[in-house]
Curated annotation (Swiss-Prot):
Function recorded in the entry: Catalyzes the attachment of alanine to tRNA(Ala) in a two-step reaction: alanine is first activated by ATP to form Ala-AMP and then transferred to the acceptor end of tRNA(Ala). Also edits incorrectly charged Ser-tRNA(Ala) and Gly-tRNA(Ala) via its editing domain.
Cofactor: Zn(2+)
Domains: entry comment: Consists of three domains; the N-terminal catalytic domain, the editing domain and the C-terminal C-Ala domain. The editing domain removes incorrectly charged amino acids, while the C-Ala domain, along with tRNA(Ala), serves as a bridge to cooperatively bring together the editing and aminoacylation centers thus stimulating deacylation of misacylated tRNAs.
The protein, known as: Alanine--tRNA ligase
Location within or outside the cell: Cytoplasm
Cytoplasm as UniProt keyword: yes
Organism field: Clostridium tetani (strain Massachusetts / E88)
C-alpha cells in the first residue's frame, strides 16, 4: 500500500469507474436545486435524488461523482475530536436501474485491493443479517477470506428513511492495528474504539417500503455508494486524524504560522487550530457556490462558521483579519478538482474579509453586553441567560446563538433556548406567512410528479406566440381531474405551447386559452422539478376537458416588454465588465414586463461616474442596432467560444447561446429581441447593496424608461415652481435655502442651550446624596441631545464628585443622558446600567460606559417616573 495524496485518491476513484462505463459528473453545488428538504447538500447521493425517484432522467444509467458536502449537526465536536468536520468530499458510484450487487461488489474489492493496494489482511466486510445474496457474491466473486465477513443488524447494515426506496448495505472496513478479529462482538468493540474504521458503504436499493411497512421489491433496483475521501486519505497516508491529511494539514500549518503556534503542544490551542482549519474549508467552498453571509438559511450557516473561526483566531491571539489569507491554501490544494475556486479566488477572499471586518465591528460591543448580562446573573445568583437577551445579541450584534452558548459554557451558564426560539419565531412570523403565499405549488407538486416522465410539452415560444395544442393533464387542488368548469382555477399541461415558463430569472408568460365556447385566462406559466410546463389557469367562460384541442395565445405586448428587459440585462452585464471590471459576474437576475433587476459581485457601491458610463455604453449598443443571434451547441463548445455561464448552474449537454453581435455572448434559455434597437432606451433607476459583496442594479427599458424620464422632468418642474427659479438655477437656489435653514436651526439650538444653562441653578437645588455619592437629576422640555449633554457635562463639573442623570421630553419622545465622575464610578456608579434601566421605564433602550451613557424612549409621559427611579438604581449598585 503506497502513500497517496487526497487529490490522487479522488482521481484514481473517478478514473476507475469511468473505466467501468460510468459518466463522470462534476460535483453539484452545495446549494440544493429544487429540494426544500435540504439546506445544504450533505451526502453524495443528495443531488441525485430526482434520478433515483424517477422524477428526472439521468444523463446516463451509470454515474460517478466526487460531491462536496456540508454537515453542521456535530459542529460542537469539530476541533475536539480528530475526525469531526463540517466539510467533506464524498466519492460515489451510482446505478439507476442498471447494474446491481453482482457488479458493484467485485468492482469495490478490485478498486480497494488492486487500485489502492490495501492489504487484504487489513480489510473486513459487513453485510445485512439476512442478505445471503451479498454473502454469496462476496465469497464467490472476490477472494476475500469468508471469516472476515460479519453479518450485522438493521441499525448497521440496512438503509431506510421512512417510507420509500430502501435496502440492505454492505460496508468495507479497515483495521488500523491489532490481531485478526474472529467474532462479531470483537468487531463491534474494535469499531467503537476506532481501531477498525468503515470507509465505503455500498447501498443496495432493492425495496420500496409502503405505509404498512411492507418491503416490496423494486422492478429496477439501484446502487448508491459512498466513500468519505478524507477518511480514505487517513488510511492511505497512515495518519489517525483528518487534520493530518496532506491537503488539510497544509491549511492547519498556515494558521499555525500566522498564530506563531506549534500544533500538538497545547490541547486548547490545538482545538482552535482544528476549528479554524475545518471552518475555513467550508466557507471557501460555500462562497464559491454563491452563498453569502446573512441572518437566515444557508447564509446563516456560513456566517456562523466564519464568526466561530474568527473567534477561535482571537483565542489564539491572532490580531486583525486573517481568514481571507488562509483560504488561498484551500484553493491552492483543491482548484484542480474544483475549477470554480481559482476562478472565484479574489471574490472569495473579499467576501471573507468583509465578513471578518463586520464581525470585528460588532464582537467587542456584543461581548461587552454579554459580560454585563453575565455580571447581572452572577449578582442575582442565577445560571440561565433569558431568551430575549440571547436574541438581542443575535439580532442586534450578529452573534450566532451557538457562539453565545460557547462563551457562556466557558462560564458555566446556560441559555433559555425556549425563550430564544419564541423571540425568533415572532420575528419570522410575517416572513413565513409571505413564503406560504408564494408557495404556488403546495401538495400539487406531488401529484404532478406521479405523472409519466414522458408526458412533456414541446416549447414553441421562440418563434410562435399562438399555437393549437391538446390538453394532456388537468390538476385541480390536490387531484388529477378530467374537467375544469367556469369559475374554477387549476393547472393544465398541454402537448405544445408558446408560453415561456418562469426560469433563468425571466418571469413566465400570461395570455389566453380559447376553444369552442370557452375562454380561459392563463395567469402564469412555470416549471416543476421534473421539467413539466405548468399553465395556471382560471376558467372565465365554458369548460375545458382532457384531450380538448385548444388555442393558446401569449400576451404579445407583455412578452415584448419582457424581451426588451432580458436583452438589456445581457448588455448591462457586459457593460459592467467593461466599465467596472472583468471580475464582475452575475449573482442573480429577474426580468418582468416592468423592469429588470441584475445582481452582481462587487465590493463597493458604484460611483456616479461608473453608473453614468455603464448606462451610456448600454444605450450606445442599443443605438447600434446590433443583431441578436441564438445557437444551440454542446456545452464545452459554448464555453470555448467565450459564452458566459453562471458559475453555480448545472447545464445540459446541449445549451442555447444568445449573442448580441460581438459585444455579448451568454448561455441563456430566455426570450430576446431580434436586434438591440428594439430595446429603445435603457435607464438605471437604482444601485444598491443586497448582501456582503453583492450589488444590485434595477433598470427600465423602452416606454417604461421614457415614462421614468418624464416623471423625473415633472418632479424637476415642480421643484422649480416651489423654489421660484429656472432649471439651471435649481441647485444654487436649493443650496442657499438649505444653508439658510441650517443657520436658523443653529440660532434655535443656541437659544435652547442658553435656556438649558439657565436651568442649572433650579436643578442643583434638588441635589441628593446616595451612599456618599452626590446625585443630580431632573426633567427638562424641548432640549435637543447636544444641549442636554452639554448641560450634564457642566453640572458634573459643578458637583465635582457625583452622578448627573437628565431627561428631555418633546415631540412625542424622550432623551436621557447620564454622566459620572471618576470618584462616583470607583464607588460603584455605572451610567450604562443606570440609563438602560431608566430608559426601559419610558419604553426605550440604550446604554454606554460607566462614566457616560445616553438613551431614548417612546413614552415621554413616563419621564418623571423614570428619573425618580435613579436613586434606587444607584443605591443598588453602590456597595
Amino acid at each position: 500500500m503506497k502513500n497517496m495524496g487526497l487529490n490522487e485518491i479522488r482521481e484514481a476513484y473517478l478514473n476507475f469507474f469511468e473505466g467501468k462505463g460510468h459518466l463522470r459528473m462534476e460535483s453539484f453545488s452545495l446549494v440544493p436545486k429544487n429540494d426544500k428538504s435540504l439546506l445544504l447538500i450533505n451526502a453524495g447521493m443528495a443531488p441525485l435524488k430526482p434520478y433515483f425517484t424517477g422524477v428526472q432522467t439521468p444523463p446516463k444509467s451509470r454515474v460517478t461523482t466526487c460531491q462536496k458536502c456540508i454537515r453542521t449537526g456535530d459542529i460542537e465536536n469539530v476541533g475536539k475530536t480528530s475526525r469531526h468536520g463540517t466539510f467533506f468530499e464524498m466519492l460515489g458510484n451510482f446505478s439507476f436501474g442498471d447494474y446491481f450487487k453482482c457488479e458493484v461488489i467485485p468492482w469495490a474489492w478490485e478498486f480497494v485491493t488492486k487500485s489502492l493496494n490495501i492489504p487484504k489482511d487489513k480489510l473486513y466486510v459487513t453485510i445485512y443479517l439476512d442478505d445471503d445474496e451479498a454473502y454469496d457474491i462476496w465469497t464467490k466473486s472476490t477472494d476475500i477470506d469468508p471469516s472476515r465477513i460479519f453479518r450485522l443488524g438493521k441499525e448497521d447494515n440496512f438503509w431506510e428513511i421512512g417510507q420509500g426506496p430502501c435496502g440492505p448495505c454492505s460496508e468495507i472496513h479497515y483495521q488500523r492495528e491489532g490481531e485478526k478479529i474472529n467474532s462479531v462482538e470483537e468487531f463491534i468493540k474494535k469499531s467503537d474504539d476506532d481501531e477498525v474504521i468503515e470507509f465505503w458503504n455500498l447501498v443496495f436499493t432493492q425495496f420500496d417500503k409502503d405505509e404498512n411497512e411492507n418491503y416490496n421489491r423494486l422492478a429496477h433496483p439501484n446502487i448508491d455508494t459512498g466513500m468519505g475521501l478524507e477518511r480514505m486519505a487517513t488510511i492511505m497516508q497512515g495518519v489517525n486524524s483528518i487534520f493530518e491529511v496532506d491537503t488539510i494539514k497544509a491549511v492547519l500549518d498556515e494558521i499555525s504560522e500566522i498564530a506563531n503556534i506549534k500544533y500538538g503542544e497545547n490541547k486548547e490551542k490545538d482545538i482552535s487550530l482544528r476549528v479554524i482549519t475545518d471552518h475555513v474549508r467550508s466557507v471557501t467552498f460555500m462562497i464559491s457556490d454563491g452563498i453569502l453571509p446573512s441572518n437566515e438559511g444557508r447564509g446563516y450557516v456560513l456566517r456562523r462558521l466564519l464568526r466561530r473561526a474568527s473567534r477561535h483566531g482571537k483565542l489564539l491571539g491572532i490580531k486583525g483579519n486573517f481568514l481571507y489569507k488562509v483560504c488561498k491554501v484551500v484553493i491552492e490544494n483543491s482548484h484542480k478538482a474544483y475549477k470554480e475556486l481559482k476562478e472565484k479566488e479574489e471574490y472569495i477572499k473579499k467576501i471573507i474579509k468583509l465578513e471578518e471586518e463586520r464581525f470585528a465591528e460588532t464582537i467587542d460591543g456584543g461581548i461587552q453586553i454579554l459580560n454585563e448580562y453575565v455580571d447581572e446573573l452572577i449578582n442575582k445568583g442565577e445560571k440561565v441567560l433569558p431568551g430575549d437577551k440571547a436574541f438581542k445579541l443575535y439580532d442586534t450584534y450578529g452573534f450566532p446563538i451557538e457562539l453565545t452558548k460557547e462563551i457562556l459554557e466557558e462560564k458555566s451558564i446556560d441559555i433559555d433556548e425556549g425563550g430564544f426560539t419564541k423571540e425568533m419565531e415572532a420575528q419570522k412570523q410575517r416572513a413565513r406567512a409571505a413564503r406560504e403565499e408564494t408557495n404556488y405549488m403546495g401538495s400539487e407538486d406531488t401529484i404532478i410528479n406521479k405523472l409519466p416522465i414522458e408526458l412533456q410539452t414541446e416549447f414553441l415560444g421562440y418563434s410562435e406566440l399562438s399555437v393549437e395544442a391538446k390538453i394532456i393533464a388537468i390538476i385541480k387542488g390536490e387531484e388529477l381531474v378530467e374537467e375544469l368548469k367556469q369559475g374554477d382555477k387549476g393547472i393544465i399541461i398541454v402537448d405544445k405551447t408558446p408560453f415561456y415558463s418562469e426560469k433563468g430569472g425571466q418571469i413566465g408568460d400570461t395570455g389566453i386559452l380559447a376553444g369552442k365556447n370557452v375562454k380561459v385566462k392563463i395567469q402564469d406559466c412555470r416549471n416543476n422539478i421534473s421539467g413539466k410546463i405548468l399553465h395556471f389557469v382560471e376558467i372565465l367562460e365554458g369548460s375545458i376537458k382532457l384531450q380538448d384541442t385548444v388555442n393558446l395565445t401569449v400576451d404579445r405586448l407583455r412578452r415584448d416588454a419582457i424581451r426588451k428587459n432580458h436583452s438589456a440585462t445581457h448588455l448591462l452585464h457586459e457593460a459592467l465588465k467593461k466599465i467596472v471590471g472583468a471580475h464582475i459576474e452575475q449573482a442573480g437576475s429577474f426580468v418582468d414586463e416592468h423592469r429588470l433587476r441584475f445582481d452582481f459581485n462587487h465590493f463597493s457601491s458604484l460611483t456616479k461616474e461608473e453608473l453614468k458610463n455603464v448606462e451610456k455604453l448600454v444605450n450606445k449598443k442599443i443605438m447600434e442596432v446590433i443583431p441578436v443571434n441564438t445557437k444551440v451547441m454542446n456545452i464545452e463548445e459554448a464555453k470555448e467560444s467565450g459564452a458566459v455561464a453562471l458559475f453555480d448552474e448545472k447545464y445540459d449537454e446541449k445549451v442555447r447561446v444568445v449573442s448580441l453581435g460581438d459585444f455579448s455572448k451568454e448561455l441563456c434559455g430566455g426570450t430576446h429581441v431580434s436586434n438591440s434597437g428594439e430595446i429603445g432606451l435603457f435607464k438605471i433607476i437604482s444601485e444598491t447593496g443586497v448582501a456582503a459583496g453583492v450589488r444590485r442594479i434595477e433598470g427600465v427599458t423602452g416606454f417604461n424608461a421614457l415614462k421614468y424620464i418624464e416623471e423625473k422632468e415633472a418632479l424637476l418642474e415642480g421643484l422649480c415652481e416651489v423654489l421660484k427659479c429656472s432649471n439651471k438655477d435649481i441647485i444654487n437656489k436649493a443650496t442657499s435655502q438649505i444653508e439658510e435653514i441650517k443657520n436658523k436651526e443653529k440660532e434655535i439650538n443656541n437659544l435652547k442651550s442658553k435656556l438649558a444653562s439657565g436651568s442649572q441653578e433650579d436643578i442643583l437645588k434638588n441635589i441628593k446624596e446616595v451612599k456618599g455619592i452626590k446625585l443630580v437629576s431632573g426633567v427638562l422640555k424641548d432640549i435637543d441631545g447636544g444641549a442636554l449633554r452639554d448641560l450634564a457635562d457642566k453640572l458634573r463639573d459643578k458637583i465635582q464628585e457625583g452622578l448627573v442623570v437628565l431627561a428631555s421630553v418633546g415631540e412625542g419622545k424622550i432623551q436621557f443622558v447620564a454622566m459620572a465622575t471618576k470618584e462616583a464610578v470607583a464607588k460603584g456608579a455605572h451610567c450604562g446600567k443606570i440609563i438602560k434601566e431608566v430608559a426601559s421605564i419610558a419604553g426605550g433602550g440604550g446604554g454606554g460606559r460607566p462614566d457616560m451613557a445616553q438613551a431614548g424612549g417612546k413614552n415621554p409621559e413616563k419621564a418623571e417616573e423614570a428619573i425618580a427611579k435613579v436613586e434606587d438604581i444607584l443605591s443598588s449598585l453602590v456597595k
